[in-house]
């Protein structure tokens, strides 16, 4: 998971530092240090990914001329030399240097966009120069950002201290009348603002990337987590350690020991209360898997037995609820890990949603028609849509939401709404996660605003509390995490106030991040800006306004009067009519979409629509593409929908595309609208989350605009869903429904006017927690059928487990606690004797089973065999995905007896697993009978393919397990510490090797027998762990580059530092051993030559 490292230092001459040296190091460049007339060369340093040197928008001409036509490193060199020349003091402070960890969850391009966003908002906006570089060391992506401490002026640099200006615009003075000054940059308050700004932007970009992760920059203590903070051992600290070691003192060792003591203390705390790990994870993620748990434990636990015990205790914690079991993906055969959440998180979100529904039913904050009319009179430039949105949020309900893109007029609309509320006697305040967003709300809309954290702090202190005459406006609501959103909703409920949520359409997409905002608006509905401008007919725009105001019946009447509503007796007939009309109206020059609420309807409509196009020859049968939901066929002309965000492709969940080229498992599609069209190449092995896009769900269409829309109405619709479905079009919309089913439920208008639909259409479990969990999972895009089955099965398993308690668990844990000293009084710790030079890797972030699963999923031979299996399923069964789930392949893989029984059943009674393809009987057509014959013929072949796959998987599993265990055994080997005498010998050997005096090197090594034996043992350990000749090549001269990355893979930071320190000694030892082998080989060759010379020769 991402880490929250953000540190700052001042580059000061008093500390022996130079800003030019720092710049050269960070840019991995060669620079001239003009002050000392010397050259600094760091061009051999590796890891530079990206670099930028940026001036603020109002930078003076001299600095622009200074860096004109320079490279990034050249601009940095020129500017910082100018700073060095300007500062005259011997202890001058030259720049502020920030080191910031980047999230590994984002790609390099996403991280660059994140840093640019942060720099623009929090550095350049304050008039500072920003010199930043992106380094991507293995497992440690980070940036270095240097900023100026003086403002730029027209003739150079300004003063470091500036006069403080009061709120009245006047200079602030002390009691004695002196002007009060503050640092222009570099103060503690300034650091805190910049730091908070970084974490706000970081979480914003994680959410944009569809990543369910929130990074909290506060300390563990402030977060309420009972753990000790560990110490960051930076580059400077490690340099001090090396220097101290050369001098024979060990100050840095105390720091490392203190860090290890804190890790041990954290281990003890986790052992006593494993729920601490859940607290850590749930502050970042709402849904997690076992690897997330392992990553947290890996920070604190070294002992493999303790690690496994804690993994078990955490996953089996009563508070943890499994939402989805480990499963096999039908399309690829790859393992999908189990997904978990906590009961507390599920209840928190469910409580928040219930409170939101309760607020929507309380009509206490109405603004009168007269007040609204007066407000609209003063704001004559408001559009009809903005007026409709104001009427919506100024309605009597105590909660409302509005959605619109940037530039859609939200600020203008909120300014007018604020005036209306104030005229009606309400106090209007606002907040946002980011200080910049809250500042914009304050300045542009006139709404008194603070950050959400600031509001929480003030309320905790009893200041500026809400009351029943307050309206709270939350901007960028989609960026707010569930816990924080729940807190604000609860505060509004208790105070009798009203809350208005403002969000962006992208925040409605069904991805894991941002679920709190969706959980609310899915229930209460929202007003949308930029909706009625889509429709080109006046009467359609009027109908859209009616829908926005909740007047569904009026909107339906308008569409009915214009013959746009089609009712058939049965739903199946309505579907047939919809497809027939769609086929008749189909025009490749127009964008079209079929919308339905239920996934099964969408799947059916996609199949039927494509069949019509194939019949007409508009698209061909197409080529096979194995999607995440099974096999599909795509051909040039097909319309597709992307189902997952992918930055590398530039596609988002719900985006529509059109295929222009297709081959097996590869397509080229066009995405974008009009002037923004571009081509996207989709390879199945890299991206498989797509489907035919002729029809899609109403949820996925949120924020979309197309020319023509056809809607299939179902009884699961409500007022909000109807509003979304009937406002996606520009030119035309038609709605189809089955009259009989709607008549039984009060008619079309009554069903579509309902305030909200049922929580869920599933009722697998009457318990409230289970219904809440299903809704929770649905908000995050999980398959709720699988979630329901998983929870029911887990509940049954839990019931059965209670009958067979594990009696020795308590004894084992007690013994473990005694071994770790949990039951004993603290003892004075002493230095460990002969600590290893490089400790072995004893714990791993994933289990052997996890690694095996990953490698099995990537095995090309297994993949090919799985393609045979899935192809046979499609030959045999009418619905292969359903048949595959019925086989319960997880059990087949885990239990040989179960596998045998399933295969026998498959061969004897294939129809018991799923409906076979085709039909038999006198009513079956020739094509259907042929399909049934092919299906029956392929049943034995399917059994054989499955048996072959299981055999191959078992063989591959044994091989991978053996290799992985051998690898883990190898990397767990400790490289022993050397005695002072052995170290001295190897240092002399290294000097001799550097002089190319190898005989002398060997002489040093053989001078003492005991030392030679110690070096041989040391070399044996190095060989067993890293290989006999690994450190002999030229690329092994320095501990850097790909070789170092490979050898340090899986190590903790302190172990990587041990490896760097030990690298020269280990390399020397291997060079010595290699020279010994050469000498020995030459000696043996000479002995052989002498023997051959001395052998008698028989003459004929």
UniProtKB/Swiss-Prot annotation:
Query: Which UniProt keywords are present, listed alphabetically?
Result: ATP-binding, Conjugation, Nucleotide-binding, Plasmid
Q: Which Pfam families match?
A: AAA_30, Bep_C_terminal, MobA_MobL, Viral_helicase1
| Binding site residues for ATP | 404-411
MF GO annotations: ATP binding; DNA helicase activity
The keyword Lipid biosynthesis belongs to this UniProt entry's keyword annotation = no
Instruction: Check the record and name the PANTHER family matching this protein.
Output: DNA HELICASE B, DNA2/NAM7 HELICASE FAMILY MEMBER
Indicate the family of this protein.
Answer: Belongs to the MobA/MobL family.
The protein in question is named: Conjugal transfer protein TraA
What organism, scientifically named, is this protein from? Agrobacterium fabrum (strain C58 / ATCC 33970) (Agrobacterium tumefaciens (strain C58))
What taxonomic ancestry is recorded?
A: Bacteria, Pseudomonadati, Pseudomonadota, Alphaproteobacteria, Hyphomicrobiales
